[in-house]
Swiss-Prot record:
Entry keyword annotation includes Cytoplasm: no
NCBIfam families reported in the protein's UniProt record: PRK05454.1-1, PRK05454.2-1, PRK05454.2-5
PANTHER family, alphabetized: CELLULOSE SYNTHASE CATALYTIC SUBUNIT A [UDP-FORMING], GLUCANS BIOSYNTHESIS GLUCOSYLTRANSFERASE H
Source species taxonomy: Bacteria, Pseudomonadati, Pseudomonadota, Gammaproteobacteria, Enterobacterales
Annotated metabolic or biological route of this protein: Glycan metabolism; osmoregulated periplasmic glucan (OPG) biosynthesis
Disulfide bonds: none
Protein name (database record): Glucans biosynthesis glucosyltransferase H
MF GO annotations: hexosyltransferase activity
Subcellular location: Cell inner membrane
Purpose of the protein: Involved in the biosynthesis of osmoregulated periplasmic glucans (OPGs).
GN (gene name): mdoH
Pfam family, one: Glycos_transf_2
Organism per entry: Citrobacter koseri (strain ATCC BAA-895 / CDC 4225-83 / SGSC4696)
Classification via InterPro entries: Glucans_biosynth_gluTrFase_H, Glyco_trans_2-like, Glycosyltr_2/OpgH_subfam, Nucleotide-diphossugar_trans
CDD domains: Glucan_BSP_MdoH
Length: 842
């Protein structure tokens, strides 16, 4: 069999179609497939002429009429996006320095963000009503939190052992020995630090407690006068003038899972009869060439399977500016003015058609709503860690989400996905300028969602949580280490966002959102410092003699005090704040029915196991988050390169590498405290033994086998597992289908396989006009690539080749026309197996 025959056999043609092609040489095959009979001055450009024919052979049902167009040089191009209609979207520079703003005001250059009234008088009255209610509620929350914190801090002060602060006179210490003064002050300095940290941490816990409590009451009563979901009855027809874009920004994601969830979502939309009101945009920032080719293939298959021509679009950016927020901004600039609303989806998002239609109805019923955030439910994971987290978010999450809505109303959170956004105000107000200055807290904003919500509210638009709208789903990280990688990014992003705390015009609620975002991670080093100071105080108490006389001529000694009854009362009160929300959550399930959670016994046992699991993980997260915060402030780059693994489980080697320092700290801490005072070790036991067990918990909890066993036992069961909605059933079905036909080593197949080469060539985006300089550069790229082995061709060079239709055509022609000359490429490709289901043959 000669090379031409092999080439023809690689195409998805019937025997009759193959027999009709010439067997003389590769160029003749391409010329025969070119119905326009174009003449190319270079023979290695001949594959460009057959692109259309090869695409129609492989994906005949994916190409809409007129979708294959000509670029400026007459090359075939697959039009994967609609025609752009550009809008202007530019950010205002941040003024984070209040002194600078004061100087601007003195010079008459201060610009106050304006509230543009878009509402009728009646709508303005309703708007003012809920804003007033929200303000009153938040003052009540502040009062409750501060009062609770003051009482708890006073109790804490009374139970600390050293009560002689008032007797210490700095003037009396001047003449005495320095060491004596130091030893007199040390326990009181430690106690003061402990007291301050306790107050901050207790205030943080108290705010969460009141949020959960109000959420419990909201869900128990079942009626919410100010719920945005109450503004519609749920069956109003959608306005055909207001179209919605479903946009999914992705970057090097699991292609099979992305397109399975997207297909299930789109089919659910079609089932509602509202598909004409929606379009889908897959916005790729992927820079792995293999994944890029797999995305293109999956997009073609998706269009064919759901008849999505003209409604499902795909774009891969070559210039990945500002990450996800920049990807969304690029969409808004090019196509945003074609839509009234857009729904942002994550790579793991799945939403029902009813939920999406409901979000659109809410937007139409509330003309001053800028963002409406759904409350996504976690599901779809099998590891013990993920199933435990799924259960926790499913059981406790509704309380906190409803509580957030109660306190915030239309000045709420936006989590960056599974939310609908009004496009016009987003374009006008939500472009993000880089933070000024230098260092780790300057540059492009990482956690864009909170900032976009704050800017939307600053412009006068509402930001709501539709906490009671069903049909929104997401997935969680499969194991602890994967979650911590995500937390590292979120930690840095939230610390950056705090620079916007004093930016002019921000609503107080969103200033509080920035503060709570920081405290989500800053609480970890504060807790660690609290434990460290408590340990240090115990060391001082055990190893030094107390200073009984703190003043000259003091008649009575100051005895260290220990009031165990108050300590136990304070400890019990703190535990109530921490664990009562969990108890309220399970009580709510007991009241409304436990069948979907496995029954009364199993859901209660699952709760107890989850509490134990959270106790084991809390100190581990504390230390990791402490490292993340310190690294961010010091400008260190936290490198986290995990070994490649075929499943979600954590290898023992990686576990000990990541948790080894925690295990060592736990051992040293436990031994030290046992030597000093066994009674103090009792109080520290949940901390130190969690650290000692951290590698083992990390590994065992990452195992799917353990997670699936708990599923068979109906532990950590959630309603989405007991009675899965159709959209999740479809996602699993399409995921299995996609796994069977998955495409690995996409770049090499795009070089060798005729069909995938045609697809890559047609979707390449670097379509420059011909020039001598460009031709020289192309030849250099191709020659350098072919003169090396494929293993030495790095990711960036592969991307350059993949982005240019001419280089892909020339690579394809040369490796087939001169296999002896480029034997290293041919031999490498022969070692790669093309999944026989990846390309359907006739």
């Amino acid at each position: 069999m000669n090379k031409t025959t092999e080439y023809i056999d690689a195409m998805p043609l019937s025997d009759i179609e193959k027999a009709a092609l010439p067997k003389t040489d590769i160029r003749a095959v391409h010329e025969a497939l070119d119905v326009e009979h174009r003449a190319y001055s270079r023979e290695d450009d001949s594959p460009q002429g057959s692109v259309k024919a090869r695409l129609e052979q492989a994906w005949p049902d994916s190409l809409a009429e007129g979708q294959l167009i000509k670029d400026n040089e007459g090359r075939d191009q697959l039009q994967a996006m609609p025609k752009a209609t550009r809008s202007s979207m530019f950010p205002d520079p941040w003024r984070t320095n209040p002194l600078g703003r004061f100087w601007d005001r003195l010079r008459g250059r201060d610009v106050t963000p304006r509230y543009l009234s878009r509402l009728t008088k009646e709508e303005q009255e309703n708007e003012q009503k809920w804003r007033t209610v929200g303000t009153i509620r938040r003052y009540i929350l502040l009062l409750l939190t501060l009062a609770q914190t003051v009482v708890a801090t006073w109790y804490m002060k009374t139970i600390l052992p050293y009560q002689g602060w008032a007797l210490i006179n700095p003037a009396d210490m001047i003449g005495q020995d320095l060491w004596v003064s130091f030893m007199q002050l040390l326990p009181y300095v430690l106690q003061t630090g402990i007291l301050i940290l306790f107050a901050v941490l207790f205030c943080w816990v108290s705010a969460g407690f009141w949020t959960a409590l109000m959420g419990f009451l909201q869900l128990l009563i079942g009626r919410d006068k100010y719920s945005i979901s109450a503004s519609t009855v749920g069956n109003e027809p959608l306005n055909p003038e207001h179209r919605t874009a479903l946009i999914m920004p992705i970057c090097n994601e699991d292609v099979d899972r992305v397109f399975a969830g997207l297909r299930a979502t789109w089919e659910s939309v079609k089932a509602t009869g509202n598909a004409a009101h929606f379009d889908v945009y897959i916005l790729s920032d992927s820079y792995n060439p293999d994944i890029c080719v797999a995305e293109q293939k999956a997009w073609m298959e998706l269009i064919a399977e759901v008849q999505g021509e003209g409604q499902i679009f795909y774009r891969r950016r070559r210039r990945r500016v500002k990450r996800k927020s920049g990807n969304i901004d690029d969409f808004c600039r090019r196509w945003g003015n074609q839509y009234s609303y857009m729904v942002v989806l994550d790579a793991d998002s799945v939403m029902t058609g009813e939920c999406l239609s409901g979000l659109v109805r809410l937007m139409e019923a509330n003309p001053n709503a800028g963002i409406i955030q759904s409350s996504p439910k976690a599901s779809g994971m099998d590891t013990l860690y993920a199933r435990c987290q799924q259960f926790a978010t499913r059981v406790y999450g509704p309380l906190f989400t409803a509580g957030l809505h109660f306190w915030q109303l239309g000045e709420s959170h936006y989590w960056g996905h599974n939310a609908i956004i009004r496009v016009k105000p987003f374009i006008e107000h939500c472009a993000l300028a880089p933070l000024p200055g230098e260092g780790s807290f300057a540059g492009s904003i990482l956690s864009h969602d909170f900032v976009e919500a704050a800017l939307m509210r600053r412009a006068g638009w509402g930001v709501w949580i539709a906490y009671d709208l069903p049909g929104s789903y997401e997935e969680l990280p499969p194991n602890l280490l994967d979650e911590l990688k995500r937390d590292r990014r979120w930690c840095h992003g939230n610390l950056m966002n705090f620079r916007l705390f004093l930016v002019k015009g921000m609503h107080p609620v969103h200033r509080a959102v920035f503060l709570t975002g920081v405290m989500s991670y800053l609480s970890a080093p504060l807790w660690f410092m609290f434990l460290a100071l408590s340990t240090a105080l115990q060391v001082v108490h055990a190893l030094t003699e107390p200073q009984y006389f703190l003043q000259p001529r003091q008649l009575f000694p100051v005895w260290p005090q220990w009031r165990p009854e108050l300590a136990i009362a304070l400890f019990a009160s703190t535990m109530v704040l921490l664990f009562l929300p969990k108890l309220l959550s399970i009580m709510l399930i007991w009241c409304k029915g436990t069948k979907e959670y496995g029954g009364f016994v199993r859901v209660t046992l699952s709760l107890l196991l989850e509490v134990l699991f959270s106790v084991l993980l809390a100190p581990v997260r504390m230390l990791f988050h402490t490292v993340f915060v310190v690294s961010a402030f010091l400008g260190w780059e936290v490198v986290w390169n995990s070994p490649q693994r075929d499943d979600d489980s954590t290898p023992w080697g990686e576990a000990f590498m990541r948790h080894g320092s925690q295990l060592l700290l736990g051992l040293v801490w436990a031994v030290g405290m046992a030597w000093l005072d066994l009674r103090f070790l009792f109080w520290l036991a949940p901390i130190v033994f969690s650290l000692i067990l951290s590698p083992f918990v990390s590994v065992v909890s990452s195992r799917s086998t353990v997670g699936l066993r708990t599923k068979r036992w109906k532990l950590f069961l959630i309603p989405e597992e007991y009675s899965p909605p159709q959209v999740l059933v479809d996602t699993d079905k399409y995921l299995a289908m996609n796994r069977n036909r998955t495409l690995d080593d996409g770049f090499m197949h795009a070089v060798f396989n005729p069909s995938f080469n045609a697809l890559a060539t047609a979707m390449a985006t670097a379509r420059h006009r011909a020039s001598k300089v460009l031709e020289i550069a192309r030849d250099r790229h191709v020659e350098q690539a072919l003169n090396e082995t494929p293993e030495k061709l790095n990711r960036d060079r592969r991307l350059v080749l993949l982005s240019d239709p001419v280089t892909m055509a020339r690579l394809h022609y040369r490796v087939w026309n001169s296999p002896e000359r480029y034997s290293s490429w041919v031999n490498y490709y022969q070692g790669i197996n093309l999944n026989p289901l990846a390309l359907q043959k006739k």
